[in-house]
Amino acid sequence: MKKTEMGRFNISPDEDSSSYSSNSDFNYSYPTKQAALKSHYADVDPENQNFLLESNLGKKKYETDFHPGTTSFGMSVFNLSNAIVGSGILGLSYAMANTGIALFIILLTFVSIFSLYSVHLLLKTANEGGSLLYEQLGHKAYGLAGKLAASGSITMQNIGAMSSYLFIVKYELPLVIKALMNIEDTNGLWYLNGDYLVLLVSLVLILPLSLLRNLGYLGYTSGLSLLCMIFFLIVVICKKFQIPCPVEAALVANETVNGTFTQAALALAFNSTADDACRPRYFIFNSQTVYAVPILTFSFVCHPAVLPIYEELKSRSRRRMMNVSKISFFAMFLMYLLAALFGYLTFYGHVESELLHTYSEIVGTDILLLVVRLAVLVAVTLTVPVVIFPIRSSVTHLLCPTKEFSWLRHSIITVTILSFTNLLVIFVPTIRDIFGFIGASAAAMLIFILPSAFYIKLVKKEPMRSVQKIGALCFLLSGIVVMIGSMGLIVLDWVHDASAAGGH
């Protein structure tokens, strides 16, 4: 069968992907996290590897000979798990504290199942549509509008991820410096100001790495991120059995040691009972409950990485890739559940939007937590340049796809992206707002709306009245409801907070 015929080869729903997926000439990997840096076009300028493919995909530049996948099943599971896990895990205890244990587990189960279903839709659409690139599926389905929707959603998600990483630097680096230098009085010290430190880290470390034309070895830092999060989970579980309940006692002790015995600490110490403080709640509804679904969707986004991982899978087939996805999603489901549960059962109603920061408020300085902070800081700092790379390339090929590489343009785009992200981190009040907004918008698009919309448009052999198409349509509508509903409630919460702040 000729290569030109492969894109029109339709596999049956029951086939494993047969000759089509095993003989695809889809040789381009979308660079997301670790997969981003394993391009098959080593001889092509990295900035010319088209992250946002144009309509001229037939050019020889993107045609290579067929290559079989070389990544083992186990390593594919690791890569996909690595693509799923991220900074969102730090906000899950906050989500549980504002939904209750039972409601959180229900929401976590539904979001994980829906995310897995969208992977199924995406894989089937890729086979039927003849592309292993997310943006190109959008272009084939809806032309320029579809391509821009996919590219815009991926870019927003990446900017959200970058912002959350820099928020971690803003929250945690001052605490690390304070602990290492044994500083108690933090008034007026610029090097303990999170905003200054974010700018300094961005200028001294992140910007030089981001200006590289080929990030190469930094691709392995995404694996470091997964290991750091596993270490973080182990520490969260251990600390549950070391921190007393109610945590008010530890909070007051910490406040007393630091010489800042605040009115809030006094109120917590004397106006709550141990029974109330240490009793888990199973269903909670308050103004912060609305952030639960966006935080969960933000935590499960991995879909731009699914197709390149599928392409690299040894003996690749759709069924085999779905098995990879099921194992990865189940592993992350357990990891997220344990992190959220033990974080919540440690602090109950005192959980902050970034769990690691909660420990410093309640426990104070701790060697084990200091090691966790250092590991997480190193991981997120080295991951930011990896995330910038596909954003910059998408912008470059959107604005000037035919121009030769220019260091000036390369530098301006990089500085602009990093500056914009720094402004978000400095002026957005909390990481919760990043999780909420990106989770309700870009993550909802990538999980719910785009895979189902592409499936409905590109899978021609199934009529609209078929069970599969009706299911995809319902999935699409549910995604629209989730996005509009979550965004609306989040905006209302922002307005309420602004009004309350103005009233004082």
Curated annotation (Swiss-Prot):
PTM (free text): Polyubiquitination by NEDD4L regulates the degradation and the activity of SLC38A2.
Tissue: Expressed in cerebral and cerebellar astrocytes and neurons.
Membrane topology value: Multi-pass membrane protein
Gene Ontology MF terms in the entry: acidic amino acid transmembrane transporter activity; alanine:sodium symporter activity; amino acid transmembrane transporter activity; amino acid:sodium symporter activity; L-glutamine transmembrane transporter activity; L-serine transmembrane transporter activity; neutral L-amino acid transmembrane transporter activity; neutral L-amino acid:sodium symporter activity
Reaction equation(s) it catalyzes: L-alanine(in) + Na(+)(in) = L-alanine(out) + Na(+)(out); glycine(in) + Na(+)(in) = glycine(out) + Na(+)(out); L-serine(in) + Na(+)(in) = L-serine(out) + Na(+)(out); L-proline(in) + Na(+)(in) = L-proline(out) + Na(+)(out)
Ribonucleoprotein is among the record's keywords: no
Side Extracellular, residues: 97-102, 178-188, 239-289, 348-368, 432-433, 493-504
GO cellular component: axon; brush border; cytoplasm; dendrite; neuronal cell body; plasma membrane; sarcolemma
Transmembrane segments: 77-96, 103-123, 159-177, 189-209, 218-238, 290-310, 327-347, 369-389, 411-431, 434-454, 470-492
Gene deletion effect: Placenta-specific Slc38a2 knockdown reduced fetal weight by 11% at the end of gestation.
Annotated glycan sites: 254, 258
Ranges per topology, Cytoplasmic: 1-76, 124-158, 210-217, 311-326, 390-410, 455-469
Annotated spans, Disordered: 1-23
Disulphide bridges: 245-278
Modified residues (Phosphoserine): 12, 21-22, 55
Name of a matching Pfam family: Aa_trans
Activity control summary: Inhibited by N-methyl-D-glucamine. Inhibited by choline. Allosteric regulation of sodium ions binding by pH.
Binding of Na(+), residues: 82, 383
Keywords, in A-Z order: Amino-acid transport, Cell membrane, Disulfide bond, Glycoprotein, Ion transport, Membrane, Phosphoprotein, Sodium, Sodium transport, Symport, Transmembrane, Transmembrane helix, Transport, Ubl conjugation
Span list, region Regulates protein turnover upon amino acid deprivation: 1-96
Gene Ontology BP term (one): proline transport
Family annotation (InterPro entries): AA_transpt_TM
Domain notes: The extracellular C-terminal domain controls the voltage dependence for amino acid transports activity.
Biological role: Symporter that cotransports neutral amino acids and sodium ions from the extracellular to the intracellular side of the cell membrane. The transport is pH-sensitive, Li(+)-intolerant, electrogenic, driven by the Na(+) electrochemical gradient and cotransports of neutral amino acids and sodium ions with a stoichiometry of 1:1. May function in the transport of amino acids at the blood-brain barrier. May function in the transport of amino acids in the supply of maternal nutrients to the fetus through the placenta.
Name this protein carries in UniProt: Sodium-coupled neutral amino acid symporter 2
Gene: Slc38a2
